[in-house]
């Protein structure tokens, strides 16, 4: 295993947001004889929810498979998501409480039209914050593994909602 660094595009932030990324990046070679698929596990923080650690796992195809399929600019667009608390979980007053949630980040999985996304949903009644990972693609015909129908969730109990936490854009 080795540490790797990747750039995630956090919504509302123009930089690579290194302050939200943790140093617990892992890259593991999995299936394949010589050129193997790579399982990546990354840890990151939600900038609007203190005390939560999110873990995202996804796969990267080897360059030989990309060349053989003639699709060198894309990777699978499905991921696993887990979360844990690292202390008191506090939801910022600026976090959206709308039913459609708020996008935490989006990562491009091809040159154009395909991305892996994580959204946050605040459940004030259930005193929880829920995260969902899903893929988004423009061309629904080229989806051989039905990744557009796959998602993953995790939830963490909230200790405090900061006052003024109204529906924000």
Protein language model annotation of sequence segments:
Residues 58-106:
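Acidic, aromatic-enriched beta-alpha/helix-loop junctions
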Residues 43, 56, 85, 121, ...:
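Hydrophobic side chains in beta-strands
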Residues 90-169:
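Low-complexity intrinsically disordered segments
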Residues 1-75:
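N-terminal secretory signal peptides
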Residues 48-56, 65-79, 131-132, 141-155:
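Short, well-ordered strand-loop elements centered on a beta-strand within folded domains, enriched
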Residues 10, 30, 77-80, 85, ...:
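Intrinsically disordered, low-complexity segments enriched in small/polar residues
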Residues 44-46, 59, 86-88, 136, ...:
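Generic structural motif
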Residues 14, 34, 53, 82-84, ...:
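Compositionally biased, intrinsically disordered low-complexity regions
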